[in-house]
């Protein structure tokens, strides 16, 4: 019996690979982090087989590199993600997201009365780790929400 271990998503020469994204989360990351606002080629793998996770999503962005802040903001959505820097088809850097103190310009406050909905301000949430949850506190209305509530928003 032979095992066919071919790449299911084409390799990139230079850029960023976000691997080990939980299945069904890849599109949300593309949208929230505005990863599609580029002229560079983006390759997306959805529901790919994974030994560790069963199924996973994968995003490859050519000629684009994420900042440390961007990598860490992934922690809410994909805490087990691996972010690889690729140069000349080789992995030259590898990092994992760690929960940041703040998340800016990504999330929308679930409080419909929050001033952030009516004014041209950038969203900003303080991140607080709780026993079984992560709480996000809006900078403007100062209300605190479970991260699940904010992510579903």
UniProtKB/Swiss-Prot annotation:
GO terms for biological process: 'de novo' pyrimidine nucleobase biosynthetic process; pyrimidine nucleotide biosynthetic process. InterPro entries: Asp_carbamoyltransf_reg_N, Asp_carbamoylTrfase_reg, Asp_carbamoyltrfase_reg_C, Asp_carbatrfase_reg_C_sf, Asp_carbatrfase_reg_N_sf. Keywords: Metal-binding, Pyrimidine biosynthesis, Zinc. GO terms for molecular function: metal ion binding. Zn(2+) binds at residues 109, 114, 138, 141. The keyword Zinc applies. Binds 1 zinc ion per subunit. Belongs to the PyrI family. This is Aspartate carbamoyltransferase regulatory chain. It comes from Salmonella typhimurium (strain LT2 / SGSC1412 / ATCC 700720).
